[in-house]
Amino acid sequence: MMNAIVVYSSQTGRIEQIAHAIAAGLPQGTPCVSVDDMPDDFSSYDCVFAGFWIDENQADPKGQEALKKIGNDHVAVFATLYDDPYSDQASKHLRSAVELLKPGSGVIGTYVAWTD
């Protein structure tokens, strides 16, 4: 069975909702925690799902700090923003967030949702 964790930084609750929806699709008991409560080490997890909101064209400050601490071979990144999720700008935001991950981390997927 896959051992995963979902971590998120949320201001309005939208990313938290998405995080819990992701966790609901994973094996029962998969942790879903705020970045304030995330572990220091992710090596015991097969996969890490990391969520944040986009603030001024980049991951929010707490999200940035969390991404810098995440190192894993299988990381899926998800975000919300006030823009077209299919735009070049959204791609740039995700790319800049992925670049914050610890060196050697493997990104297995990304997702961005528009929020109002």
Model region roles, listed by residue range:
Residues 2-25:
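N-terminal beta1-alpha1 ligand-phosphate binding loop
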Residues 4, 25-33, 44-51, 55-116:
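FMN-binding flavodoxin-like domain, especially the glycine-rich phosphate-binding loop
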Residues 11-12, 38, 55, 83:
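Short beta->alpha junction loops/turns
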Residues 38-44:
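Short amphipathic alpha-helix with an adjacent loop that forms part of the alpha/beta core around
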